[in-house]
């Protein structure tokens, strides 16, 4: 008689940690969680701390916290002072020298929030990759989430890296984001940039596709239950379709003359449109970071000043951008002490 004895497989520390991280629990951790959870916790904690207690008086000449009387719309974690350049503003660095109060005053919370926020978003993307691999599905959710990551990184990190300092990045707040949008329009003519146009088409197109798709599915649900609505009739494990693709195809064929006949192509298109919009707008922001002026009237104004033969049309768009610059240059960058003589300020139709 032969007795087979199983050899003990030596399990190292990595295997033990891997088992613990991937254990079935209410909130999955995984290897991606080692990046996601600490970074997200620190980024959100820094944002709540900054909007509650920390002033922007020393960086922007503004009150920006609840403690100073701001509300949810006006509170923000403001970007560092222009004089800080592109320093990462470590608490132990030469600027703050370990002084937490000074670190908050010079804008250290902004770099802390931005960097931990970026790594938190990357961790969330990796989390979707990891769980997709474990449950055996495709990783298109993670690929789609690359769009928001591209926008965050390009706007909050790449754009200010191309400018003079972190000062020109958007601060983390509602009104602060709108200020940044005005800045992009006035100094870069952002709305006339084709990459912005593609981004708008992608986001609004994605919203339209989402609304059409949701309404069409609701319209073509099979009546397979006795309840007042069809929600209770659905079971997650049913083998039958929940709605009629054939009916939906006939409906839109009658309306548009063409319709999606393939669910895979339909849903890929719903993925492709908004994600492509996010990526193209991110590419446009990188162009602004490098001060590419192909769609910026400032370059035409400079050329017109140098070349008497060069003509530009003075449009409402030019008037808008000049007005934004005249207002924001002094208000937004008080440390520069800009003074504009009245004769150079735009005067609308009184020209």
From Swiss-Prot:
* Reactions catalysed, as given in the entry: 2 a plastoquinone + 4 hnu + 2 H2O = 2 a plastoquinol + O2
Q: Where is this protein found?
A: Plastid, Chloroplast thylakoid membrane
Q: List this protein's GO terms for biological process.
A: photosynthetic electron transport in photosystem II
Its predominant location is: plastid
Record-annotated membrane-spanning stretches? 39-59, 123-139, 151-164, 206-226, 277-293
The entry's chlorophyll a ChlzD2-binding residues are: 116
**Keyword Thylakoid set for record:** yes
Q: What is its EC number?
A: 1.10.3.9
The domain of life for this entry's organism is Eukaryota
Residues engaged in binding a plastoquinone: 213, 260
Question: What's in the keyword line of the UniProt record?
Answer: Chlorophyll, Chloroplast, Chromophore, Electron transport, Iron, Magnesium, Membrane, Metal-binding, Oxidoreductase, Photosynthesis, Photosystem II, Plastid, Thylakoid, Transmembrane, Transmembrane helix, Transport
Recorded GO molecular functions are: chlorophyll binding; electron transporter, transferring electrons within the cyclic electron transport pathway of photosynthesis activity; iron ion binding; oxidoreductase activity
Task: Name the Pfam families for this protein.
Answer: Photo_RC (PF00124)
Cofactor note text: The D1/D2 heterodimer binds P680, chlorophylls that are the primary electron donor of PSII, and subsequent electron acceptors. It shares a non-heme iron and each subunit binds pheophytin, quinone, additional chlorophylls, carotenoids and lipids. There is also a Cl(-1) ion associated with D1 and D2, which is required for oxygen evolution. The PSII complex binds additional chlorophylls, carotenoids and specific lipids.
Q: Which residues does the record give as Fe cation binding sites?
A: 213, 267
Q: Could you give one GO CC term from the UniProt record? A: photosystem II
Topology with respect to the bilayer = Multi-pass membrane protein
Q: Where does chlorophyll a PD2 bind?
A: 196
Kindly list the positions annotated as binding pheophytin a.
Answer: 128, 141
Q: What does this protein do?
A: Photosystem II (PSII) is a light-driven water:plastoquinone oxidoreductase that uses light energy to abstract electrons from H(2)O, generating O(2) and a proton gradient subsequently used for ATP formation. It consists of a core antenna complex that captures photons, and an electron transfer chain that converts photonic excitation into a charge separation. The D1/D2 (PsbA/PsbD) reaction center heterodimer binds P680, the primary electron donor of PSII as well as several subsequent electron acceptors. D2 is needed for assembly of a stable PSII complex.
What is stated as this protein's family in its record? Belongs to the reaction center PufL/M/PsbA/D family.
Q: What else is known?
A: 2 of the reaction center chlorophylls (ChlD1 and ChlD2) are entirely coordinated by water. Although originally identified as Cyanidium caldarium, these sequences derive from Galdieria sulphuraria.
Name of the featured protein:
Photosystem II D2 protein
Q: Which gene encodes it?
A: psbD
């Amino acid at each position: 008689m032969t007795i087979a004895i199983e050899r003990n497989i030596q399990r190292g520390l990595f295997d033990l940690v891997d088992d613990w991280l991937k254990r079935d629990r209410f909130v999955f951790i995984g290897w991606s969680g080692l990046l996601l959870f600490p970074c997200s916790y620190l980024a959100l904690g820094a944002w709540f701390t900054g909007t509650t207690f920390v002033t922007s008086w020393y960086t922007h000449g503004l009150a920006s916290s609840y403690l100073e009387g701001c509300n949810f719309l006006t509170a923000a974690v403001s970007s560092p002072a222009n004089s800080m350049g592109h320093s990462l503003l470590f608490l132990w660095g030469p600027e703050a020298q370990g002084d937490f109060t000074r670190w908050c005053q010079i804008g250290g919370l902004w770099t802390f929030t931005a960097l931990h926020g970026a790594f938190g978003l990357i961790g969330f993307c990796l989390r979707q990759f990891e769980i997709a691999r474990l449950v055996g599905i495709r990783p298109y959710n993670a690929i789609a989430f690359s769009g928001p990551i591209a926008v965050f990184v390009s706007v909050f990190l790449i754009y200010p890296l191309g400018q003079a300092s972190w000062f020109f990045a958007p601060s983390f707040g509602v009104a602060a984001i709108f200020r940044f949008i005005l800045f992009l329009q006035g100094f870069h003519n952002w709305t006339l940039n084709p990459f912005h146009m593609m981004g708008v088409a992608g986001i609004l197109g994605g919203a339209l596709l989402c609304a059409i798709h949701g309404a069409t599915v609701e319209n073509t649900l099979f009546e397979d239950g006795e309840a007042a609505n069809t929600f209770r009739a659905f079971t997650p494990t049913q083998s039958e379709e929940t709605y009629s693709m054939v009916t939906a195809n006939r409906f839109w064929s009658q309306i548009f003359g063409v319709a999606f006949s393939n669910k895979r192509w339909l849903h890929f298109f719903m993925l492709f449109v908004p994600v492509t919009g996010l990526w193209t707008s991110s590419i446009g922001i990188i162009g602004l970071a490098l001060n590419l002026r192909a769609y910026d009237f400032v370059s035409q104004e400079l050329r017109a000043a140098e070349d008497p033969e060069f003509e530009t049309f003075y449009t409402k768009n030019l008037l808008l951008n000049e007005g934004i610059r005249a207002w924001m240059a002094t208000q937004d960058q008080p440390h520069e002490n800009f003074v504009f003589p009245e004769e150079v300020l735009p005067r609308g139709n009184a020209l």
